[in-house]
Every structure is written in C-alpha cells, then in structure tokens.
Amino acid sequence: MSLVAPLSACAGNTDTSNAAQELVDRSTLTVETMLGNGSSQANQATQFLRRAKAVVVCPRIFKAGFFIGGEGGQCVLVSRAATGSWSDPAFYTMGSGSFGLQIGVQDAEVIMMLMNDTALTAFLNSQFKIGADAGISVATIGAGVGGSTGTALGADIITFAKARGLYGGISLSGSVFSNDSALDQQYYGQIIDPRQIVVTMNANNAGANPLRAMLAKFGG
C-alpha cells in the first residue's frame, strides 16, 4: 500500500507533463496550418507576426451555448528576444462567459499577436481580460471573425482566428487569460514565473524547439 501513493503521484506528474507537451505540439501545428496555407489571411498574419513582441497560440477554443454561452481553451505564450529568437512557452488557460439567446457550438484556433511591450506587460499582469484595459487596443481578424486588416494597424493586440461551427463569428472580448503554473512547473521541472520563461528566458525544454522554429520560420 505504501507503494501506491508514490506511483500514483508519478503517473499524475507524467500525465501533466504529457499534456503540456501535447499542447505545445498542437500549438506548433496551429502556427503551421494557419500561417502556411498561402491564403491572403495567412500572408497578412505573417506580416504582423514579424513585428510582434510576443504571440499567444490557442490550438483549440471551444464555445458552446444554449441560452448560456461559455468559452474556454488552453494556450501558450511565447515572446521574442532582442536578438530575434523566440522564448520557450509559458502555459495559459482562457475562459469567458456570456449570456444571451445563442444556440450552437463553435470550435476555433486562435493566434494572438502582442505587438509591443505594453501588450506583453498587460498580459503578464495576473489575469488579463480582453477589453478591460482601455489603454490596450485590440483588433480581431479572421475567417468567421469580424474585423479587417485596416482596423488592425496600430492595435496593441491583433487576433487571427479560424472558426468553425454554428455561430456566425467569434469575439474574444471579455475572455480572461490566466497562467497555468502547474503546467509550467511540470514542463520545466521547477516552480517558475511566466516572466522568467518569456522575458528573462531562464527556462528551456527541448520539446518546444519545433514551436520556436516554426515561429522563426514565419515570424523571423
């Protein structure tokens, strides 16, 4: 009986570590498929990514509603160093809730460009809620999403999304991003703050190299 608890704990740690790597792998695929398909939207996104300070990749956001709508998903945050290289990822959860007469299911992939230090700092400050900070401008562009390239120019945050489902579009307004410290700890083997991962870049996991390479391919 004394062996059960340690083995269970070990299995739990392995599951969490695997979940973190799977999220990184799915994020890599999202970057590749959304930015590498040759469409005008992909080309526009690539231009913004080349100027971005950081990027948030959410490989799957699921939204469902029947009178009460909810939205959520898991994401990774990666920032660009002064040298141009990309950091390893910090892990985040995204969630929001809305009320209204809405029936349907929506599935979306999202790439969110943080265009400057102001946007990155706001994102790193505890919970970040889109639309809550009047000093942070947000533009949303993408298939099934309202917006235009023109409105994105000069925005602090630019969101590209590929949406599917019964809703006509997706709005990230009101979405709250929170750091997933458990995934960070499991992925890097230590208790670590998101700033140490994406700002001072004191963490490394070779499993994130394909994601970093994919961002370098499209974003320089």
Question: Model regions: which residues?
Answer:
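Sec-dependent N-terminal signal peptides
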Residues: 1-2
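C-terminal motif of bacterial Sec signal peptides marking the signal peptidase cleavage site
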Residues: 6-9
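Small-residue-enriched, tightly packed secondary-structure blocks
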Residues: 11-220
